[in-house]
Amino acid sequence: MISFFAAIIVLIVGYLIYGKFVERVFGIDDSLKTPAIEMQDGVDYVPMNWKKIFLIQFLNIAGLGPIFGAIQGALFGPAAFLWIVFGTIFAGGVHDFLSGYLSLKNKGVSASELVGIYLGEGARKVMVVFSVVLLVLVGVVFVTGPAGLLNTLTSINTQVWVVVIFAYYILATVLPVDKVIGKIYPIFGAALILMAIGIAGGLIFKGYHIPELTLQNYYPDGAKSIFPYLFITIACGAISGFHATQSPLMARCVEHEREIRPVFYGSMVAEGIIALIWAAAAMAFY
């Protein structure tokens, strides 16, 4: 379990040191009004406490990704720990910080609009199409995945759960951000964290064996090579471009620029820890 605990510690230290470095490089000015204050409209631009925003952002970017991906990526052995840790610190955390930072600095606009601002109208149109197609695919997974899980836990048909979840998504989309998302998402986000803590506790106190990171070649015959398969199997939990579509939603609710690091970089680190726990659990059972 040494590798597992070391990975978690490195992630936390990475947030404290490298996250602070990233913040200093991009520059934070707390004297400036954020879009949540300057453009407050009671719908999308609603000031909220940063801790609540953190839980919402965490749930927005985490979901099923760091669970399913980490479980599948565990097949590559403890090398998955390295990718999750260094991917989160140097790639995913920076990506999420920057996507939230740029949106906040540009009146809370979406990822496609940001592309238009910096790369031109043609690039914006490409990004709009690209985002819509991929978000539809992600949305399908985020509907059918939970529906399938709920079907196994209840006697209610999967199709019924699909309708219920889809209706909930529509409500969360059309209502002001503080009415559904601001009230329910923090609860779900906290539940996701507690679930991971419970799994970690089970691994520790039940004495499950988690493989250690060594110089051993786990796949000497070339099967399941980590290049490139590990890096596309574990995306959420290391780095995911999907997060750029979610960060602007919360950039419109941040009250002070000093909250950018804990909300965006911090939620990515939290997702990395979730991925580590699920990867460790999968390795213990594999």
Would you name each region that the model predicts?
Residues V10-I67, H256-E259:
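Membrane-interface "cap" regions at the ends of multi-pass membrane proteins
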Residues A7-G19, S131, L135-G139, G189-K206, ...:
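Selective recognition of specific alpha-helical transmembrane segments in multi-pass small-molecule
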Residues M48-G65, G202-Y208, N217-A281:
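Hydrophobic, membrane-embedded alpha-helices of multi-pass small-molecule transporters
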Residues G73-A79, L104-S110, I117-G122, A251-R261:
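Juxtamembrane helix-boundary/capping and inter-helix hinge elements in multi-pass membrane proteins
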Residues G139, V143, A147-W161, T173, ...:
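Hydrophobic alpha-helical segments and their helix-loop junctions in multi-pass secondary transporters
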Residues M1-G19, G73-S103, S112:
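Extracellular loop-to-transmembrane helix junctions
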